[in-house]
UniProtKB/Swiss-Prot annotation:
Lineage: Archaea, Methanobacteriati, Methanobacteriota, Stenosarchaea group, Halobacteria
Gene that specifies this protein: proS
UniProt record, GO biological process: prolyl-tRNA aminoacylation
Keyword ATP-binding: yes
Catalysis: reaction(s): tRNA(Pro) + L-proline + ATP = L-prolyl-tRNA(Pro) + AMP + diphosphate
One of the record's GO cellular component terms: cytoplasm
InterPro entries linked: aa-tRNA-synt_IIb (IPR002314), aa-tRNA-synth_II (IPR006195), aa-tRNA-synth_II/BPL/LPL (IPR045864), Anticodon-bd (IPR004154), Anticodon-bd_dom_sf (IPR036621), Pro-tRNA-ligase_IIa (IPR002316), Pro-tRNA-ligase_IIa_arc-type (IPR004499), Pro-tRNA_ligase_II_C (IPR016061)
GO molecular function: ATP binding; proline-tRNA ligase activity
E.C. number: 6.1.1.15
SUPFAM superfamilies the UniProt entry points to: C-terminal domain of ProRS, Class II aaRS ABD-related, Class II aaRS and biotin synthetases
Name of protein: Proline--tRNA ligase
Amino acid sequence: MSDDDQELGITESKEHSPGDWYAEVVQKAGLADYAPMGGFIVTRPRGYALWEAIQDNLDGWFKDTGVENAYFPMFIPEDYLEREKDIVEGFDPEVAWVTQGGHDDLDQRLAVRPTSESIIAPYLSQWVRSHRDLPLRVNQWNSVVRWEATETKPFFRTKEFLWQEGHTAHATDEAAWAETTLRLDQYHRLYEDVLGIPVLRGRKPDHDKFPGADTTMSVEALMPDGKSVQGGTSHHLGQSFADAFDITFADEDEAERTAYTTSWGLSWRAIGALVMSHSDDQGLVLPPTVAPKQVVIVPIWQEDTKDDVEQYGAEIAAELEAQGVRVHFDDRDGRNPGFKFNEWELNGVPVRFEIGPNEVEDDEVTVVHRPDGESTVEDRAAIADRVHDHLDEVYDKLYDAAADRLAENVREADNRADILGTIGQHGGYVKAPWCGDQDCEAEIKDQIAAEIVMVPLGEDSAARAASELEGERVPEPDHDGEDCAICGDEATRTAYFAKSY
């Protein structure tokens, strides 16, 4: 291996050192660098292009369902935060505060937003007067800061991160529930149809829901190292924020009523899940749906065939561009084909075209898939049409591998020892009957650093959650009459235990 190849390649093992491997892929594939301040990163163009692809999909779906983009200040007055006590208690340890402007002390501390409910709700109160103003839906693409003390990991855990946060107000509880479920479905669609990652939909236990929320629902993705990633959350806020910030409206009979609100967000943690799920010991692996370049064309020539090969490759590149394919023709001098193969594998381009004198003579193209190196030969005349089939095949390979991994790593347990032993040996998700008591989760968390990442959603999930909010405990059908795996009391739901990012 040349010095260039040695510097270019991944040296850590995904299987044996997943943390070091992940950090190396993120840096060497040009996604991000570490900032001089601990807990912050510099997002490079290739990494930001992945975020833009996520934005483009979600933003279109949001707008198709009545959401408008807006922007609110990044600083929140302290007394605004204090108006919703659960927000204060939930986020205070993570809030970064501004206390000085220039050389002057501020009259009131300003929080660097950890989330924006407390700065958006007062304006919803101003903008909503009548039932005709509802539903009101706004979203903003921004960054937030949470001064977490835990070890940081690019895209998974950083003090500042990019995300979108949607905020809505509704006339009825039923409409707010429909909104909460719709946004969760859109996050599910993003992972399943765009990122190539199968996810589970669930509800957070009460002790782990968003501060001030009635219910928090999430999508959860399983990583190859057996840990779960919370991929996006949708919160039914009930009337807590509306009460705190006086979001009221006149109904059709001119009676004053309190609105119901929701909030929902997805961060660049999705990029971390994308990298961790699909990439390998050769570098980044990306699904064609989000890859900045979907196809790279690498010419292979001797001096006497250079002109013919490069002309052939350039013509194919032009045809692919006309088909809407994001293609790069790598005609650099000074880099041999082997170096280019390794570099584009490291950078995660899903499909590689190899073109040499034989391809030119036979009017063909050699096509190589990034995930598994599968190589096929296609007729030149059909390549502009066939390329989409190859891109779909690559996506299916990535999704199917992730789906198989998920299916193999959801296990069941009916007692405490089995929960601990299964997670300790295999990782992944362990389904167990649970009584709903936080102390039972704490026993598992203290022993093995695993927690309840979700309670699965059934077909009637919204009605179930609403019933529980009214004080009814509704056993799930598959655990009716069973005992909690930890304490032995009556089980009222299924819990998914896992270690998580």
